[in-house]
Regions:
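Catalytic activation segment of kinase domains across protein kinase-like and atypical kinase folds
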Residues: 33-102
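Conserved structural core of kinase catalytic domains
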Residues: 1-18
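Alpha-helix capping and helix-coil boundary motifs
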Residues: 5-9, 30-33, 69, 104, ...
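A long amphipathic alpha-helix within ATP-dependent nucleotide-binding catalytic cores
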Residues: 14-32
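A conserved mid-domain beta-alpha-beta active-site/ligand-binding segment of alpha/beta enzyme cores
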Residues: 86-136
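Regulatory N- and C-terminal appendages and interdomain linkers associated
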Residues: 51-55, 119-191
Length: 191
């Protein structure tokens, strides 16, 4: 979708995504802390079906939500595919951040813009931020291209390193210990 839209279509997509994520934040304000839902709003999780008036969310990962402030998904599930020699480190430094980032409207908005770098469309970051910054709550500082780029660089470093360590774990498991590796790893990811 990102690689086929013109400027007006892209702006409409971002406006649509921002409007749909705003519904999540409204739900959380109305229902929280009883029930709160999280959303990974990156642009690659959305489609605009032909003839539909709004974007549709298609994230295939496990839904993240809280009841009375208590996470309903066992955070340890995120560590199942983490190499065993790294689980303690991931638990200590990353797990909480992964579990909370998608409840924060600003962090979701930054992730939405930063994801355009991963999608090889850096020229769309400024137009996306233009749309996103128009709808930020009054008094909240706008998101800059620099902030989005910095977020992306850190995210890219973390996930590239993580994948490299998973490949090392697969090598050790299959070649050194001659055991079955239980996970399918992606091929080269262009970031």
């Amino acid at each position: 979708l990102l690689h086929h839209l013109d400027a007006a279509g892209f702006s409409a997509l971002v406006e649509n995504v921002v409007a749909e994520t705003a519904r999540v934040w409204a739900f959380n304000r109305e229902r929280g802390p009883g029930v709160q839902i999280a959303i990974d709003g990156q642009i690659s999780n959305w489609v605009l079906p032909q003839g539909a008036g709004r974007a549709v969310y298609l994230d295939t990962s496990t839904p993240i939500f809280r009841k009375h402030g208590q996470e309903q998904l066992d955070p340890e599930l995120f560590l199942k595919n983490t190499p065993s020699f790294l689980r303690w480190l991931a638990r200590m430094f990353f797990l909480d951040e992964v579990m909370t980032r998608y409840y924060d409207p600003r962090r979701v908005a930054v992730d939405l813009a930063a994801n355009l770098y991963k999608e090889q469309r850096p020229e769309l970051v400024a137009p996306a931020l233009s749309v996103i910054n128009r709808v930020l709550p009054a008094g909240e500082e706008g998101i800059s291209e620099r902030e989005a780029a910095s977020y992306y660089r850190l995210d890219r470093t973390i996930w590239s390193s993580y994948l490299a360590l998973r490949r090392l774990d697969r090598f050790l498991t299959t070649r050194v210990f001659h055991q079955r590796y239980e996970f399918i790893l992606p091929g080269r990811i262009r970031r």
